[in-house]
Regions:
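N-terminal Rossmann NAD(P)H-binding glycine-rich loop of SDR-like oxidoreductase domains
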Residues: 3-26
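NAD(P)H-binding glycine-rich loop region in Rossmannoid oxidoreductase-like domains
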Residues: 40-42, 50-88
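Conserved Rossmann-fold NAD(P)-dependent oxidoreductase catalytic core, especially the SDR/UDP-sugar
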Residues: 92-137
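Catalytic helix-loop patch of NAD(P)-dependent Rossmann-fold dehydrogenases
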Residues: 121-161
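Glycine/proline-rich active-site loop of Rossmann-fold NAD(P)-dependent oxidoreductases
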Residues: 156-159, 171-195, 236-248, 271
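Mid/C-terminal beta-alpha module of Rossmann-like enzyme folds, strongest
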Residues: 221, 229-281, 287
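Conserved C-terminal active-site "lid" loop/helix of NAD(P)H-dependent oxidoreductases
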Residues: 227, 277-297, 318-320
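Amphipathic terminal alpha-helices
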Residues: 302-326
Length: 326
């Protein structure tokens, strides 16, 4: 088994490679990492190919002799690059894989942006049968296009693939920084822009916890997944017979309720909180299908996600750095 990993230097790619190479189920597996802006050090069972996924020659070289692809390469809100990576790059991957005699399975890690994330109201849990609904911008559109391209290869060529649709992927101290009123905030929303500079400075100083409210004034429920839980699902899907041509929501059992986060942090750390009005809506991704067909179970709930993030201490050689906008 030889697995090509695109986006190998990201949080999911590095975690996947680390766990695969130490997994007793995959002692015979080797990894080829396709790297572009950043790279990895080669080691036993890990080789590196450099180049852009938008270049068919690079993709052909990367796919040669591989049995599986774990496709993680993506773009955020970068219109100048997103179609080269999402459409052209994935198209070249799919074309090379379908024409390879030894190829077995293509794993795509998609995103809940394809379902509108928390932008649109979802009156019932979001399952894998719900229609796509991208919100404004190129990133959400790219998530829809990825899923549709893979689905159509099933129809056109009886292609063996699987899509694992993930919400916001957390590791280390990500969640803590997603709650920051400062310029160091991770992702969105940017709380400082919602409350104003003066209040934001005060909240940042006091480590105040934002409670995101929907238009009706209720705390928003938002979906997350820890990188370790997502990687566990990838490791299952690579060989699982019931994963062929299937789409799975890979997320926590329940979305994170911002009101409950505030209560938890008040109880465990004595942190104050403040309500923040937004236009965002609660969404509940349903992960029942992955549990039923793959036997997958998430190990992170709200308390563990929050506690590990707030407890996390970075070493000097692991500075916090954001590699993409959004």
């Amino acid at each position: 088994m030889k697995i090509l990993v695109t986006g190998a230097t990201g949080k999911v790619g590095q975690c996947f490679i680390r766990r695969l190479l130490s997994d007793q189920r995959y002692t015979q597996a080797t990894v080829r990492a396709l790297c572009h802006n950043r790279t990895l050090e080669e080691q036993d069972r890990l080789e590196v190919v450099r180049g852009s996924i938008a270049d068919r020659k690079v993709v052909a070289m990367a796919v040669e002799d591989v049995t599986h692809v774990v496709h993680l390469a993506t773009c955020k809100e970068t219109p100048e690059e997103v179609m080269d990576v999402t459409v052209k790059g994935m198209f070249w991957l799919l074309e090379e894989c379908r024409q390879s005699k030894g190829f077995e399975r293509f794993i795509l890690v998609g995103g809940d942006a394809a379902m509108g994330h928390f932008v649109y109201p979802h009156p019932i849990p979001v399952t894998e049968t719900q229609k796509h609904s991208a919100y404004e911008g190129c990133y959400a559109l790219s998530k829809v296009l990825e899923e549709v391209m893979l689905e159509q290869y099933y129809v056109q060529y009886d292609f063996d693939g699987c899509c694992l649709r993930a919400p916001w992927i957390m590791e280390k101290d990500d969640f803590k920084y997603s709650m920051s009123f400062g310029e160091d905030v991770f992702g969105g929303p940017r709380w400082s822009e919602l409350v104003g500079a003066e209040d934001a400075q005060k909240h940042q100083k006091n480590s105040t916890v934002p409670i995101m409210l929907d238009p009706q004034g209720k705390p928003v429920q938002r979906n997350f997944v820890h990188v370790e839980d997502l990687v566990a699902a990838i490791l299952l899907a690579i060989q699982h017979p019931k994963a062929k041509q299937e789409l799975f929501n890979i997320c926590m059992d329940e979305p994170v309720d911002y009101g409950n986060v505030a209560k938890h942090l008040l109880k465990t750390r004595g942190l104050p909180s403040v309500s923040v009005d937004t236009s965002f809506r609660s969404t509940w991704l349903d992960n029942t299908k992955a549990k039923f067909l793959l036997g997958w179970r998430p190990q992170y709930d709200m308390a563990r996600l929050v506690d590990e993030s707030y407890d996390y201490k970075r070493s000097e050689d692991d500075p916090r750095k954001i590699w993409y906008p959004g």
